[in-house]
Design a protein with these regions (language model features):
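Transmembrane-helix motifs of polytopic, lipid-linked glycan transferases
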Residues: 153-174, 212, 426-430
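Transmembrane-helix signature of polytopic, membrane-embedded enzymes
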Residues: 166-189, 441-444
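Short acidic/glycine- and proline-prone juxtamembrane loop motifs at membrane-interface regions
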Residues: 192-206
Length: 500
């Protein structure tokens, strides 16, 4: 399945691209033709660099190879750190939309105002947002003030740590200079990560927790240390509290862990699977109960799941499954009754599916358009959500950053587009050549999560921002995929020694 998914993404990423102009309040995608030749040339350049680094490793020896790996990961981390700090410190990028609502809820809770918990208010409507609101309230209480700038700095550090996690994964799984160096450098060059440092929401923690969990799982299988499992459970729990989409990774962890246990009994791994499932759910229930006790208000279940599923089936103005202003009208019409609105949304889903089936070719076109509007957007809405700012702290730097959403916007999109194609193609190589019956199943955690994320994006509300985390999970997979291509070439073609 993974090969088919990536073949689909590679085919369209090679020929077209979509972007969203950084204009607040207008989530309108523009689709334009892409350059097949330039995309293929970029991939060929990556393969050439892999070949060069492979030759260097053979001739230079292990000592120099180790230093080259360290230099590569240092460069990747430095770029993400410096670029991220410049992005968040040059100007005041004030939270808006969902992030502002969550921060506002945390501040209200500190002040003893629990109005947001009402069924028709933000945390009552989106009950899952109590997780990040509770975490931010705790942080603000520790700091003594509600300063979102601290969170932005923390996100920069998490980005840097994420690059090191990719380094750790590649070092443990492969160890080859080309794989480790190129994987960390490519991940370090991702501009979407830089732009999302100012987005005070769950995307950056979600990425870090995913990469950290994958690294710890590889280390556990290799070294057998219980601390690695503790790290996984902690990361998955925190990730789920901050961004509930992390549950896709939790399910992936349980799947690969279960397969591993069936083939080789491991009591500690089994316990970690149970805890990874139970702790996030228990923490959420504890948070719900805590706010019930503090506010004296009954916990609102909010929008039913069927509302998001119906939204993912709707088309408004050529936008497939994307949010629109009146999508929650049925919930409000039932006086915010979750059970009654759930029944209404289910009936609407059935009617919508029948209408889609009645139009020949529409169903295929709808879901193709929906998938591409999420996965074929190389910036993943990172500039769209983060281009705006308030006070300027460093005029020259802020002026340069403003140009990224102005006259340099096309260049940013094109660079991100080349990188996206490189990663998608490398990930395709990974699924074709690295996923084998005899491969260690626990090394496939991120691969299973990417497949799960793709399937999730078919049914749920559409948004390119939601795919950013899965894109970052692809970087170590792509690095290993290109490495396997070079290994096969080395074995069968170019680097084979001639017999005398």
């Amino acid at each position: 399945m993974g090969s088919l998914i990536l073949l689909f993404l590679v085919w369209y990423a090679m020929r077209t691209l979509q972007y969203m102009l950084p204009v607040a309040g207008h989530e309108d995608l523009v689709e334009i033709p892409d350059s097949v030749i330039r995309n293929l040339a970029a991939a060929a350049l990556i393969l050439l660099l892999y070949a060069v680094l492979t030759a260097v490793e053979k001739k230079a020896g292990d000592k120099i190879a180790i230093w080259c790996k360290r230099i590569a990961v240092t460069l990747g981390m430095l770029w993400q750190g410096i670029a991220g700090l410049c992005w968040v410190l040059a100007a005041d990028r004030v939270p808006s939309a969902d992030q502002a609502s969550v921060i506002g809820a945390a501040i209200d809770f500190i002040q003893g105002d629990y109005g947001t918990l009402a069924p028709d208010h933000y945390c009552g409507l989106y009950a899952h947002q109590l997780g990040p609101a509770a975490m931010e309230e705790m942080l603000f209480r520790i700091l003594g003030e509600a300063d979102y700038h601290v969170i932005q700095i923390v996100f920069v550090l998490l980005n840097v740590a994420g690059i090191y996690c990719i380094y750790g994964i590649l070092k443990e799984v492969s160890g080859r200079l080309a794989v480790v160096a190129m994987g960390t450098l490519l991940a370090g060059s991702c501009m979407a990560s830089v732009f999302y440092t100012s987005w005070v929401y769950g995307e950056i923690p979600w990425v870090f927790c995913s990469l950290f969990s994958a690294w710890m799982l590889v280390r556990y299988i290799k070294y057998g240390k219980t601390g690695s499992l503790v790290g996984i459970v902690t990361a998955l729990t925190l990730g789920t509290l901050l961004r509930k989409n992390t549950l896709v990774l939790v399910v992936a962890y349980c799947m690969v862990g279960a397969v591993r246990i069936f083939s080789k009994w491991d009591r500690r791994l089994l316990i970690s699977l149970v805890l990874a499932l139970a702790l996030p759910l228990l923490c959420y229930q504890g948070i719900y109960k805590m706010y019930e006790m503090r506010s004296g208000m009954e916990h609102s279940r909010g929008l039913p799941t069927s509302a998001y599923l119906y939204l993912g089936m709707e088309e408004i103005g050529g936008r497939y499954g994307w949010y629109y202003s009146d999508c929650w009208a049925q919930y409000y019409a039932t006086d915010c009754n979750t059970e009654q609105s759930d029944q209404i949304y289910r009936e609407m889903m059935q009617e919508r599916m029948q209408a889609m089936k009645a139009q020949p070719g529409y169903l295929r076109g709808f879901y193709q358009g929906k998938l591409l509007s999420q996965w074929n957007v190389p910036t993943y809405q990172s500039l769209y959500f983060n281009f705006n700012h308030g006070d300027v702290y460093h005029e020259k730097l802020a002026a340069l950053e403003d140009r990224l959403s102005g006259d340099l916007f096309d260049s940013v999109v094109r660079m991100a587009d080349r990188l996206q194609f490189i990663i998608y193609l490398g990930c395709l190589f990974y699924f074709i050549f690295c996923v084998r019956k005899d491969s260690e199943i626990t090394q496939q955690l991120l691969a299973v999560a990417v497949i799960g994320g793709f399937l999730f994006s078919i049914f749920w509300e559409a948004k390119a921002r939601y795919m950013y985390a899965y894109y970052m999970m692809m970087f170590p997979l792509a690095a290993l995929g290109y490495g396997e291509i070079i290994r096969l070439a080395e074995k069968y073609c170019f680097f084979r020694k001639k017999k005398i």
